[in-house]
Amino acid sequence: MNIGLVLRTVAHLRSAQVLFQVLRRVHKARFKALACPSVEVKPMVVEPAAKWQSYDGKRFAFLNIEDEFRGWNNTAHGMLWAYNQNYMDWLCQPGMTAAEGARWIDRFIADMPTNRVGLDPYPIALRAINWVKFFSRFPKESTAERRDSLYSQLRLLERKLEYHLLGNHLLEDAYALYIGSAYLKDSRMHGRASRLLRRQLREQVLSDGAHYEQSPMYHCILLDRLLDCINAGEGEFADLVLKPVAVRMLGHLESIVYADGTIPLLNDSAEGIAPEPAAIFAYARRLGLQWTPVALGECGYRKFDNTDVEAVVDVGNIKASYQPGHTHADSLSFELRLGGKPFVVDSGISTYDKTPRRQLERSTAAHNTVVLAGKSSSE
């Protein structure tokens, strides 16, 4: 272990992160089956952006690895693969039927007593949003038993908010509580979610509309879910808080995206994970939003383009210094396209597992820049 590296990293953590790292080990919140207090729901009315095809009726495909269902706790392909299975994104993929989706929801509910992975806060958050979208699309599948399970999972999420990580994880928690409580018409939960969401958007979305973890892929993911919040919510909070932030984020995406509609693979970014920019723009238009490109500034990226040349350069520092989990040591790295085709590319990422491969992909040596004195630029 490199003690100096550990100390230089820990020095940037916030006191709340340290405190909640301890608390979550001492006090482990348990799942409790509860009855949803409301019998009415408020479904989304605008069609969301479609999810990538990850389930073919027999096998799941996540992170370029295919396998059949072997239980919710199947970590043979790594924890992130198991997380993806528990997100249940495939409920929102094209071609998903009401009967097939309901069957998987019922199977999940039946298996909850032995499901360890699926009751981690991040999978709860993403799954809750997917369930709301599915129930909005197929209202007859929103039975009392399934709503009770959704409500119980959201109540567990309230007790397991990811203050030990902060960053996009806590923002996703806020999104889920906001969308879930809007659907279930739970005013208490909705008020708490609105306050948390307001604080996190204020902190995490930079002045030029970029998400502060500086990953174009995560920017698309978080913008898509912000649009989901606008779809689920209503009133002054949506109009005065959510929509202005969404417009700014849309303007940033418009500025950073390449002419062919793809994103630069900077920091933790890969293809086939987030909704495509075109799908996000179409979703925003269905919600009645209008935006214009926002000049790249605080995000640290600069884009140069003319008829034949497009270049994106990273000239900034790490913004979320207390949560650099999706950041790479890529200072002054760049991508270059000539005649609309990739010429100098970033390698992107292939894994989140704690392996030498993960460390290499985040290092300066893996990017289009120089290594000085054998050290990554983060050092």
For the regions a protein language model found, what residue spans apply to each?
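Short alpha-helix boundary/capping segments
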Residues: 119, 124, 324, 328, ...
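Residues that flank catalytic or metal-binding motifs in active/ligand-binding sites
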Residues: 86, 173, 300, 330-332, ...
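Extreme N-terminal leader/anchor segments
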Residues: 1-70
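Pocket-edge structural micro-motifs
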Residues: 64, 74, 92, 305-306, ...
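Aromatic-lined, polymer-binding surfaces characteristic
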Residues: 69, 78-246
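Active-site rim segments in enzyme catalytic domains, especially the processed small/beta chain
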Residues: 332-379
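Carbohydrate-active enzyme catalytic cores, enriched for enzymes
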Residues: 210-349
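Short polybasic amphipathic segments
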Residues: 58-62, 71, 302, 334, ...
